[in-house]
Amino acid sequence: MKLKLNWESALLALLIAEILLFGALNPRMLDINMLLFSTSDFICIGIVALPLTLVIISGGIDISLGSTIGLCAIALGVMTQAGWPLWLAVSLTLLLGLLCGLFNAALIHYTGINPLVITLGTLYLYGGGALLLSGMAGATGYEGIGGFPDSFTAFANLTLGGLPLPLVLFAIITFFFWLLAHRGRFGRHLFLLGQNPRAARYAALSVNGIPYVLYGLVGVASAVAALVMVSYFGSARSDLGRDLLMPALTAAVLGGANIYGGSGSILGTALAALLVGYLQQGLQMVGIPNQVSSALSGALLVVVVMGRSLSLHREWVRATWRRLFSHKTIGA
């Protein structure tokens, strides 16, 4: 717990240092209103990174979430375009996200194939479905489907207590997942499953049932992200979630999730999501192209994974270092 608290404190310090650094380059970065309301640009990274953290803790992975967002977004647009009531379209969008997640879990359960391979396949399946729906609706390219009610598009711009509503929603979701992962029996079962699946089976845990809950949560969170993004941009497009996978995965791993399973922190992921989001925002404000920002996110993920791997095998690293150093000393 102390180590986890220290890591989360380090992430908070890094977040503050990042804001101050970009603020020195562009003073607008230090404006409190800009800091608060710019979160609407990237808060969906955190919304999907939180359940993704749970999946990683369990020893799984889901790389189809970006396509799930696109499919849910365009499905919402098609239903709204057809004149369906908004409450029904939103409800069915959430249901679609849940079904996508459950379908991933079912494929993993019944085939026994690695989750990375399964979700890679469904990434293309859901992405293709989104493009098909988009084409059928006549929403090609970057046009998307518009015409949403003002009550829906206003959501992303509303405030509650002076805070943007999407940021408040993210805080509520963070608290929910924190309770789920760190303050209950389900969380203990989750960590045991990731650390030792065989022991989890011997303990009579629902080893096959837990992934359905986890991947279902990723699906629902992807649908929520789709709703927030459509409200924010005012149009539904099949490519809305295309660029969210890498930042979300980076946030989960940077936040403390072990890519091999068995450890992770919801609060760490939430802080890391803000860290990654403000990194992208700050780079844009100082004139760095989006391509460079994406490359830096990828590089950050590689560095974090390498660091985690070295920490897990630190004894081997130390032994190798001593062996190499002793050889050099003898040769001298």
From Swiss-Prot:
It comes from Klebsiella pneumoniae subsp. pneumoniae (strain ATCC 700721 / MGH 78578). Pfam families: BPD_transp_2. The gene is lsrD. GO terms for cellular component: plasma membrane. The chain crosses the membrane at residues 5-25, 43-63, 83-103, 116-136, 160-180, 210-230, 259-279. InterPro entries: ABC_transp_permease (IPR001851). GO terms for molecular function: transmembrane transporter activity. This is Autoinducer 2 import system permease protein LsrD. Its main location: membrane. Part of the ABC transporter complex LsrABCD involved in autoinducer 2 (AI-2) import. Probably responsible for the translocation of the substrate across the membrane. The complex is composed of two ATP-binding proteins (LsrA), two transmembrane proteins (LsrC and LsrD) and a solute-binding protein (LsrB). Keywords: Cell inner membrane, Cell membrane, Membrane, Transmembrane, Transmembrane helix, Transport. Belongs to the binding-protein-dependent transport system permease family. AraH/RbsC subfamily. It is a multi-pass membrane protein. It comes from the Bacteria. It is found in: Cell inner membrane. PANTHER family: ABC TRANSPORTER PERMEASE PROTEIN YPHD-RELATED-RELATED, AUTOINDUCER 2 IMPORT SYSTEM PERMEASE PROTEIN LSRD.
